[in-house]
UniProtKB/Swiss-Prot annotation:
Main location: cytoplasm
A cellular component term, taken from the record's GO annotations: cytoplasm
Organism annotation: Listeria monocytogenes serotype 4a (strain HCC23)
InterPro entries: Asp/Orn_carbamoyltranf_P-bd, Asp/Orn_carbamoylTrfase, Asp/Orn_carbamoylTrfase_sf, Asp_carbamoyltransf_Asp/Orn-bd, Orn/put_carbamltrans, OTCase_ArgI
Keyword Chloroplast appears in the UniProt entry: no
Name of the protein in question: Ornithine carbamoyltransferase
Reaction catalysis annotation: carbamoyl phosphate + L-ornithine = L-citrulline + phosphate + H(+)
Length: 316
């Protein structure tokens, strides 16, 4: 009867997207669109469910969207930082995972080490959601796919150019795109490439889905005829000491500006996961212009994560 019961996804983790298949991801996106269109219909489906949220990194979009999302579905959230928990004083992750599994229904964690999230998931008896690690940002990728789907009514064959650092956002975008059949072009300077293992995994996924993956150091080559142009900050949290070098290494060549965007399709859309540094990775003219859909994209974090929560928490 309900879309969220289509696949047996109850209890699944969301660590890197690789726990899910193409059909399951597509169902999440379609459910997210349905929830956005008719939120009242889903307002009680997670009644009685509790989401624990652990933050080791500052957050605006992840915290507010997850907390609002579980509330809008009838559940509740408990927000914590590692400093407030015994894990911050040396308690083993194993013990924390088992104990929290006795109290709540799922954990969303935003932290630095991806291995920490994997260890938490290994020991927990409840679903674990990666709210961001240094290696992956799967929930952002869900919102990205949703935004693309809303504009194109499809995912297969859509041309997406990512310009900038081969970081966690890029990793998840690459994996998601490879799973659903996007035409992905990556442009980044030497020394800032995506993780080799993740690229190899994406290339294998692309063989199954029909996705295309192209990597270059030439931004104009990547952006040529693109439907979407995506970028992210050149200096992420924890890399502040590298900022001067990074600004020099990326420079104007990798900035998304009017000149670069001119080779994309005339009706292209601009994406950015935020927060943004205007006049660094993107000009104000582009990010605040008519082609930009960054606020729709940010808003879709809410809807995509609501769909994810419904899928893993056995929605009523």
């Amino acid at each position: 009867m309900t879309m969220y019961a289509k696949n047996n996804t109850a209890g699944k983790d969301m660590l890197s997207l690789l726990e899910w298949n193409k059909e399951e991801l597509t169902d999440i996106i379609k459910l997210a669109v349905a929830m956005k269109t008719n939120p009242a219909h889903y307002s009680h489906i997670l009644s009685g469910k509790i989401l624990g949220m652990i933050f080791d990194k500052p957050s605006t979009r992840t915290r507010v969207s997850f907390e609002a999302g579980i509330l809008q579905l009838g559940g509740q959230a408990i927000v914590m930082s590692s400093k407030e928990l015994q894990i911050g004083r040396g308690e083993p992750i194993k013990d924390t995972a088992h104990v929290m599994s006795e109290y709540i229904d799922a954990i969303m964690i935003r932290t630095f080490s991806h291995e920490k999230v994997e260890e938490l998931a290994y020991h927990a008896e409840i679903p674990i959601i990666n709210g961001l690690t240094d290696l992956h940002h799967p929930c952002q990728a869900l919102a990205d796919l949703m935004t693309i789907y809303e504009w194109k009514d499809q995912l297969e064959g859509v041309k997406l150019a990512y310009i900038g650092d081969g970081n966690n956002v890029c990793h998840s975008l690459l994996l998601a795109g490879a799973m659903v059949g996007l035409d992905i072009r990556l442009a980044m300077p030497k020394g800032y490439e995506v993780d080799e293992t993740i690229l190899a995994t994406a290339e294998n996924l692309a063989k199954e889905s029909g996705a295309k993956i192209f990597v270059t150091v030439d931004p104009k080559h990547a952006v040529a005829d693109a439907d979407f142009i995506y970028t992210d900050v050149w200096t992420s949290m924890g890399q502040e000491e590298e900022n001067a070098k990074r600004l020099a290494d990326f420079g104007e060549k990798y900035q998304v500006n009017a000149e670069l965007a001119s080779v994309a399709k005339p009706d292209y859309h601009f994406l950015h996961c935020l927060p943004a540094h205007r006049e660094e990775e993107v000009t104000a003219e582009i990010i605040d212009g008519n082609h930009s859909v960054i606020y729709q994209q940010a808003g879709n974090r809410l809807h995509a994560q609501k769909a994810l929560l419904a899928a893993i928490l056995e929605a009523k």
